[in-house]
């Protein structure tokens, strides 16, 4: 079950994330659920597989903002690294970072 404690156990900074949601746990958890289902993950993967660094950057950058605002640090870190790599138009190493992201995303989704 997706709970504040379960998120914290996976490394999310729930105190910070909750603070951004005025300590409204139900609202925060609803936003986290929405973030876990965001279509940006699929857009990012499709763009990387197609070698489209610009589209991949746009998807990664959008995810970075969402995940950062919710303080979902284990997801934010690989997305942030991907964003900076793609900002420079580079794709080397991006599939490895995507693999890390997908692995962590699976852990978070398994909480539901």
Go through each PLM region and give its residues.
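Two-component system phosphorelay core
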Residues: 1-112
